A protein has these predicted regions:
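Conserved redox-cofactor binding core of oxidoreductases
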Residues: 15-135, 139-141, 204-226
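FAD-dependent oxidoreductase catalytic-site/capping-region signature
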Residues: 28, 34-83, 90-91, 210-213, ...
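Glycine-rich loop(s) and the adjacent beta-strand/alpha-helix scaffold that form part
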Residues: 30, 128, 137-228, 233, ...
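Classical protein tyrosine phosphatase
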Residues: 23-26, 163-189, 322-327, 418-426, ...
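General small-molecule cofactor/ligand-binding pocket signal
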Residues: 78, 118-120, 185-189, 265
Length: 438
């Protein structure tokens, strides 16, 4: 739901790596094309697109306290993280419409599927059909048997960061050593398939609240929860109209970085064992490293398409990533210790007030850190030896196949990947139209 495009320098960096036509000025029209912005038209926003983007319908007392504390620590208030600059603290924008979640399925599919398309569901795609250097179709199966769908022009892979490289490898397209280790015949050697996995690493500081103003209070009290639900149903405001993650502040983790590389997110709730809400009022301040050094991998587990791939994130493998996580956690703590935020803190639950050294904080990062599920990069766009697709999203060395999803990002964007993934879909669709219809 959170809609943060990233920084202009992210996309200019793509172009600098050889991804022609993917600089910020080139991708901005596709961000605008997809958007139906509640605020209306401006230099950075548009209306009439399929994706509804809105502000949170009500301000929260904890969000206001978070902004004020962040301001005292040097982060100015930012009314629009998708505007001129990402620097500062403010409320996030979300993909909602009338205070309800608005997905890309809502915007692009419902009531809009053309009559000249057949959608097949509940099937497993097993492999691509590769004939004389060209992808000519896909093999798929369901409970009744195995079939082949033939392509007269090209096959578009949009299986996501985990399954797009998996499908290529199942088809014999990838690193020779990986394929041969799984007894898959090499059809087209491409070293970068499944490499370059990137994600945002998050680590939280968790607090018991001194006042009953968090989402936990709604889950732990039937009357409060019921009243909040009625408020939402009648007026589309209140905590049920928000996603629980009210606010962000974007900061530099150190003086060595020239633009924000940490996203600190205020979450108006906290969880305990098995991610169940704690039985008391609490909140979390999550530090997220948004430009990581580490690179992971996604590779097939076997030649059986029904098996899930092997995913290795390699979080905290570099000194830079360790330092950023520690500094981000320290900043989250500083926000909680700064008025007016400090007035809502009864006790630090995690890491705990006794954890003060960098070594202790790093151990907390290792034991409590998590993936933010912003996974990208495993079919990297570019011109180097580990790139998988070119700037037109066509797989290197093959005809008749493109990859159009978040896996093509050469480097992860500095924010939630939702908006950038939608932009890639829009730009990729236009490339297909340009190549076949013009």
């Amino acid at each position: 739901m959170i809609y943060v495009r990233g920084q202009a320098a992210d996309f200019d960096g793509w172009e600098a790596q050889g991804c022609e036509g993917w600089g910020f000025n080139s991708v901005m029209p596709y961000f605008l094309k997809c958007e139906d912005q509640e605020r209306g038209v401006s230099q950075y926003h548009a209306v009439g697109g399929p994706v509804s983007v809105a502000d949170l319908p009500s301000k929260e007392i904890l969000g206001e306290a978070f902004h004020e504390a962040s301001k005292k620590l040097g982060s100015p208030y930012n009314n629009d993280f998708n505007g001129e600059s990402q620097v500062g603290a403010g409320y996030v924008q979300v993909t909602t419409k009338n205070a309800r979640c608005w997905s890309t399925a809502d915007g692009y599919l419902k009531g809009k599927i053309a009559t000249n398309i057949t959608v097949v569901t509940h099937v497993m795609v097993n492999s691509l059909v590769l004939e004389r250097g060209q992808i000519t179709g896909v093999n798929y199966s369901d409970k009744s048997g195995t079939y082949t769908a033939r392509a007269t022009k090209e096959v578009i892979i949009s299986a996501g960061t985990f399954n797009s490289p998996k499908l290529l490898e199942l088809s014999g397209i990838g690193n020779r050593e990986v394929l041969e280790s799984k007894d898959i015949a090499v059809q087209h050697e491409l070293r970068g398939v499944g490499e370059n996995l990137q994600d945002h690493f998050g680590i939280g500081a968790q607090y018991r609240a001194s006042k009953p103003v968090t989402v936990n209070d709604l889950s732990n009290n039937v009357i409060k929860g019921g009243l909040a639900l009625m408020r939402y149903l009648l007026f589309k405001t209140g905590p049920f109209a928000n996603n629980g993650n009210y606010s962000n502040t974007f900061i530099n983790s150190s003086q060595d970085v020239d633009r924000p590389d940490m996203m600190i997110t205020f979450m108006g709730w906290c969880t305990g064992e098995n991610l169940r809400p704690r039985p008391f009022s609490g909140f979390t301040i999550l530090a997220e490293h948004i430009r990581p050094d580490c690179r992971g991998t996604v590779h097939v587990r076997s030649d059986d398409p029904r098996e899930q791939p092997i995913i290795k994130f390699n979080f905290l493998e570099s000194d830079a990533d360790k330092k950023a996580a520690i500094e981000g956690l320290k900043h989250a703590r500083k926000i909680a210790q700064t008025a007016p935020m400090s007035g809502f803190v009864a006790e630090e639950l995690k890491p705990g007030s006794d954890k003060v050294t960098d070594e202790q904080l790093l151990e907390h990062c290792r034991s409590e850190g998590l993936s933010l599920l912003h996974c990208v990069g495993t079919c990297k766009m570019g011109v180097d030896e580990l790139s998988v697709v070119d700037s037109r999203l066509k797989v290197h060395g093959l005809k008749g196949v493109r990859v159009i999803d978040a896996s093509i990002m050469p480097t992860i964007v500095s924010g939630n990947t939702n908006a950038a993934a939608i932009m890639i879909g829009e730009k990729g669709a236009q490339m297909v139209i340009d190549d076949w219809c013009n």
